[in-house]
Amino acid sequence: MAKTPSSRAAVEHRERLGTRMAGIASDLWNIASKTRSVSIVSSPPGAGKTTTLVAICVHALATGKRIGVACQTNAQADDVCRRLKAVIKPQRICRFVSGTNAAPPPFVGCPVEKSALNVAGGPVVVVGTAMKWALIESAPPINLCIVDEAWQMAMATFLPLLRFCDRFILIGDPGQIPPVVSAPTQRWETSRNPPHRAAPEVLRARLPVHEASLPATWRLPFDTASLIQDFYDFPFESASLEGERSVTFDKVSSKGTPVVDAALDRLNRHSIARVLVPMPTAGGLAQSDPDVAAAAAETVVRALARNAKATAKDRGIELKKLEPGNIGVAASHRVMVQSVLSKLPSDLRGLVKVDTAERWQGLERELMVVVHPLSSMENPGEFDLETGRLCVMASRHQSGLVVVGRDHIGDTLDGILPSATQPLGRPDAVSRGLRQHRAFWSHLDKGEQSG
């Protein structure tokens, strides 16, 4: 096991990060309070985006301002309201809902309004989905609009916000899955203002924006921060130090597949392990790949059979026994999700969350089992090389990650020659994705070689 840092060093490390985060929130408000501006805040996974948002709201309310918060989903909006309640009087928080939304308020005492005209006067934080804000015809003045999970918002969804505010702070994770647009987008690919692209990407290219980035991931263990660093164009670290997070397992008499047990044992020393399934000697690979699905399911079953226990010294957790609800499985395709579910014992289905990368966004578990997106792909296409899904899946764990896949992935990545078919003037997303995939796989290779 890695050497555990002294408690003093660990405390000072996290105090330093907390001070930096507080300074970033203060600076963002100072910029927004002085002039019309757009600030873009890039965040690694689990870096305190909502904490930063709440801190900015506190600064703004203290000076009598009105803030609008545009979230991407109702669940995100409710979560923001609950987080605000911890530091702001409930009457200064308003949950903005659609006319057909019959959901209860996110907490007792939180005003819920269907019309912007009914929102109370004076300092207030109005929280709603971006789609709800887009439908507003008129509203009382908003001094600052904060966009939560901004890289999930298409530029077309951002534009209506300009009708009632001229100061914006966009906070989000640029490694996440790009906005989902159902309409054909080919005609906009060469546009200077592509409406289907993530709003921060377009604004950054067209306007003088203030840039900031959150300094650390508070969710991910020390060595996972370096694993996913290549998905981002800004540096960050982990709030946990080397040796503070681990998952340990009992030695039991029942026998499991050696490669699965070896991967689990590795989590006592590192936060990342890998289970490789040999390529079949004959025939091709199916998207449902029952062998890989079985390996992913067995990893979950063996972790529970061997009484998995998580330690996170930075969070005050010592040998917490993991229940089925503390373990998750992620895959990039629904077909593989169903295949894994079919291999799980019936008593674990519904207790262990098994879902696609899209549905894992914003969630976390102590231990994650991830089916590598290229595992069943012998000839990956552009969709397969897009790294948002891999980044999401590889950043949901708090203590341990097991990547499951076929053993051809490294050779497949080495054999890909990008075709550079991107539209004129657009970045070569395929080559970028290929570089990131190779860096990710190389990191796993080096980790295993280091023991």
For each feature predicted by the language model, list its residue ranges.
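Short, well-ordered alpha-helix to beta-strand connector turns
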Residues: R36, G64, G122-V124, I142, ...
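ASCE P-loop NTPase helicase motor core
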Residues: R16, I31, V38-P105, T129-S238, ...
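Pre-P-loop entry segment of helicase/translocase ATPase cores
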Residues: M1-V38, G99-K114
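Conserved helicase C-terminal RecA-like lobe
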Residues: A305-A330, V335-S395, S399, V404-L413, ...
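Conserved RecA-like ASCE ATPase "motif II neighborhood" in helicase/translocase motors
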Residues: C110-L161, D355-E358, V371-V392
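Helicase C-terminal subdomain and adjacent C-terminal extension
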Residues: A2-A10, S26-I31, R187-V209, N379-G451
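Short, conserved catalytic or adaptor-binding loops enriched in Gly and charged residues
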Residues: V87, S115-A120, A199-L207, A263-H270, ...
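Conserved helicase/translocase motor-coupling segment
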Residues: S240-S342
